Amino acid sequence: MGGKRRTAVDSVVGRNIRVLRLDRGLSQTELGRRIEVTFQQIQKYENGTNRVGSGRLFKIASILGV
């Protein structure tokens, strides 16, 4: 399996997660706790380093109210 490349979509999704998380007053640790991942994983999502799967994105959207 080849390496995954960061895409513009991954970056935009991550940026939107960060903006909404901060707007809701949540830390990376708290958001991670709520979706059962580490704060490091939230950092990777927000930086666009790791792609957010659809199921996890749905959980994040529900928590952030979008």
Q: What does each of the following model-derived ranges do?
A:
Residues 1-12:
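A detector for short, charged/polar N-terminal pre-domain segments
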Residues 12, 30, 46:
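Short glycine/serine/threonine-biased micro-segments
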Residues 15-30, 34, 59:
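Short basic helix-loop element that most often maps to the first helix and adjoining turn
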Residues 26, 37, 66:
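Short glycine/serine/threonine/alanine-rich loop segments
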Residues 35-52:
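Recognition helix of helix-turn-helix/homeodomain-like DNA-binding domains
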Residues 53-66:
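DNA major-groove recognition helix of helix-turn-helix/homeodomain DNA-binding modules
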